[in-house]
Amino acid sequence: MMRLQIVPILFLLSALVSGRVLDTRETERRMHPLFSAGSGAGSRLKRAMPMIVFDPLKAEEQYAEYWQGLAHQTLDQQLESKLRLNTQLAKNVMLFLGDGMSIPTLTAGRVYLGGEEKQFSFEQFPYVGLSKTYCANMQVADSACTATAYLGGVKANYGTVGVSAAVQVKDCLAQAQPAHHVASIAAWAQQQGMATGLITTTSVTHASPAGIYAHTANRNWENDAEVIADNGDPSLCPDIAAQLVNSPIGQKLNVILGGGRQNFLPKTVRDVSGAPGRRLDGRNLIEEWQRQHTNSAHYVQTRRELLGLSNHTSRVLGLFAPYHMPYHLDADAEEHPTLEEMVQVAMDILERQSAGRGYFLFVEGGRIDHGHHDTLALRAIDETAEFDKSVR
């Protein structure tokens, strides 16, 4: 009842501050401005996206029949695809996640691509839907509990990854109980003999990719220093980076590509960029991974090394940044591969290693979300466009 009383009071205050009664007509004009077509034959005015040049209006767009034809074409395509019943068993599974890619982001992204009429590749899929998201204990979800949901099919508590709702955030003892662990799609795929991999533009120990292989009571426990800072015991509750290298699921991953070198290195060691490691246990997890996987397994740190891998590569660990990979607009083209390039290399390796049994690949465009968090709209939208390229 209190909430219903507050709304008119706030509205009244806004009117008083303005010093005059709100003009409905003026407000309507501001919200829905009308533009003149202008005299230039090649000009085309679009809605509120400055500094972007759009293609001239197509002649056929002037006619109602053009738009009606598009509608009929779309309807025919959908009907045809639904009439052909697909009874084939899927061989390869690729899960693409655009973290932070809301409907408004898609709308702005289409304009960024060239106009409202543009479409992302995934918008042309035969089936498109929406899902509601929430954690077991919170209405507004984070990337941790949702990773457990879409990768394991289980609702979890806010801030936890790969564990059931029996584990509260930072509860080390509960994390240590195998009965609370939630298996991921990658675990199921490995049980079927399939090749598996993960790709992200964030750190490979971040919440979303961690749902593939980790079971943790705190998404921030990406290295042992973070576990200790929360009065946890790393020997009882291994950090996420340690789980990636030493857990049964992490050890079997054929492809691991993203950022996050600092979480794998001791604080006494600096990576290739000069950034110090974060670990307090003195372990170099990169070297541990290399000792586990010899012969045709490779560790790479640059785009050149990734694209130069031999056709005999069976496994690859690629860490291209101290933490998250740079935004595409800020990246060094020689040092940092694009998401599209990482996907292509991963598919080649997984196809070879699947031995005909198929593969599972998780792909995250994770920095869309970061751009929105930091109000970097252009970068969020450009990351969306880059994500779209990886899906095509």
Where are these regions (language model features)?
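Active-site His/acidic residue clusters
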Residues: 207-214, 323-333, 357-358, 362-390
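N-terminal catalytic scaffold of extracellular/periplasmic and nuclease hydrolases
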Residues: 17-314, 322-323, 385-388
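Long hydrophobic segments that form regular secondary structure
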Residues: 335-356
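Cleavable N-terminal signal peptides of Sec/SRP-targeted secreted and luminal proteins
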Residues: 3-20
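Short, polar loop/linker segments at the starts of domains and inter-domain junctions
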Residues: 272, 276, 331-340
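Flexible, glycine/charged-enriched surface loops at secondary-structure junctions
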Residues: 297-301, 354-360
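Short, well-ordered amphipathic alpha-helical segments that serve as non-catalytic structural scaffolds
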Residues: 342-346, 387-392
